[in-house]
Amino acid sequence: MANKTPLEASPDPQGVVEKITQESGPGDVSEAAAPAVPDAAPSPTAKPPLDLTKIKVEKSCSRGMGQWLHSNKVSLALTSYQTGRVYMVGSDAQGRVSFFERIFERAMGIVGNADRVYLGGLYQLWRFENILRPNQVIHKVFDRCYVPRNAQTIGDLDIHELGIRKNGRVVFVNTKYSCLSELSLTHSFKAIWKPPFISKLAPEDRCHLNGLAMKDGEPKYVTAVCRSDSVDGWRDRRHDAGVVIDVESNEIVCEGLSMPHSPRWADGKLWLLNAGTGYLGWVDFEKKAFVPQMFCPGFLRGLSILGNVAAVGLSKPRNKRFEGLALDEELSKRDADPWCGVQIVSLTTCDVLQWIRFEGDITELFDISFLPGVRNPMMVGLRTPEIRELITFESAIAEGTPA
């Protein structure tokens, strides 16, 4: 058996250190998205839209979650497009879990580090910069303060996962147009690649391109639910038509998947989430097959890998069941209920080391990013006084220069 790294130490899937019921209101959140104008009158039986400023959420964690984050000096950034939430999850000086939330409508792909975070939203791509110097804190507890410095309007592209190229440019999965894109100074996006089976760029979400794996600072692999080249063609092909595509060669390197998501290259392997089955695993390139490693009880979406440890996002079904997916049968076989939350797992032993669980109005997560070297982060929102009053600057003016 391989030796465990410090990140893999102290598996503690039992017990709860923190259980918080929170009802968000105007005073609790930083920004509130304006309601969209409906295209048509809603059905009398339709579920009312969720008010993003007034949701009730209960969070619980494994007993060792806070200490694990603290001892490894790492934090998590999570998104939930359903509730428009970004959660920064860190630890305080006592090793207790710290949750810091902000509202960004339809928060989707997120990727970041100690200095910078990118976030995909409903119609903008956000860039946040940390304004704190080393060993500096704000509000006496936060060692990183991510401030929105740029929001590029791209339109509603159903933006999914993001990556950072070695030249510093952000690349994103443009799901609506079935392509990979970069930002354009003039237009909504610049298409840089599309799957070989997609005949044209059209706003039709043909194959549900969704996940992106970066390798050596370049986009290398993507996941798609199927190879459809017709409008919305993926919805009837969720069971076993999923593929992984090599962006450089256009080769299908894995097939027969069920709603694959979140490919990640780590330590010589391509890991991904076969969401329709509930399994985390890796790709056998010789057989072009998925090798399942461990089952997680939920629809898997959002994966971040740090050393031999992964953070896996889990979501509940939208209509009580994962209809047409093997995941339903797997849950029934294990007498398990689906989760909404995060499981920290060892890629060596496939054990769950720690976990976070959400209950209440939040039932779906989208993306996860480890923030190495960050202990307790915060993020400035759009509707608090901080967005107006928190001003920092750099200067090229020599001190003491006379007027």
Label the predicted regions:
Residues 59-71, 103-116, 152-169, 198-220, ...:
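Beta-rich, blade/repeat-based domains predominating
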Residues 61-73, 126-137, 222-239, 313-337, ...:
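Short, conserved, GDST-rich strand-edge loop motifs in beta-rich repeat architectures
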Residues 62, 257-347:
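Loop/turn-rich, solvent-exposed surfaces of beta-rich toroidal or solenoidal domains
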Residues 78-81, 118-124, 164-165, 170-177, ...:
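Conserved beta-strand positions in repeat-built beta-propeller and related beta-rich domains
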Residues 91-93, 131, 184-187, 247-249, ...:
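Short loop/turn segments that connect beta-strands within beta-propeller blades
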Residues 95-163:
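Blade-loop segments of beta-propeller domains
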Residues 97-102, 136-151, 190-197, 254, ...:
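Beta-propeller fold detector
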Residues 347-403:
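Blade-level signature of beta-propeller repeat domains, shared across WD40, Kelch, NHL, RCC1
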